[in-house]
Amino acid sequence: MVVGGASGLSAAGGGDFYYEDNDSYRKYFRPFAEKYHFKGAFAGMMHPWKTREEYWGYLATFLHTTQTAPVRHSYLDLDALLKGKDFFILTTNQDTQFVKLYPEEKVAEIQGDHRFFQCAACCTDDTWDAVKPVADMVAAMGSDTKIPTDLIPRCPHCGGEAFPWVRGYGNFLQGKKYEEQSKKFLAMCWNTKTAKFCSWSWALAE
């Protein structure tokens, strides 16, 4: 069984702060909402930040919110339905909910993952850990909305800024890590009765 999981699953479990000024948005992003007046977490990605320190203060808050969130009840409800079944997860979600619940080999995150950084300029095919740098930025920021300059994450190869390995609001790197995710899905397809349909559908999408 192939299970497709998208943003509605997270929103149903309380991760509904992306598009509107609601209680969960205010819970996690109140300092930014009150100071910069944008409504919804995704709006912050388009905000005209005056400094990189402010920008990364916001981005670190965004990433930390999803990295540290517990498994949401909507995912636990889905898990109950999947008990005893042979399944594979294909998701466009980047918020790490599925990989908190299931082994990595059972999940293909084809739109990226908030746990990793890439080079913003895509100078390298590498991705690397974002969890500790994000935690350090949030700790250093405290109740402020900006981070110290020396904590702005950098690419270890070119020295330019890093960026979350996610599609949608940056220069998404479709390199080694992306290929790993797509190969997991294709391998599952070839091992099932739906091999031809899955593989051709994926090939056409690419």
Task: Cite the ranges covered by each PLM segment.
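Conserved catalytic alpha/beta core of Sir2/sirtuin-type deacylases, generalized to analogous enzyme cores
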Residues: 1-206
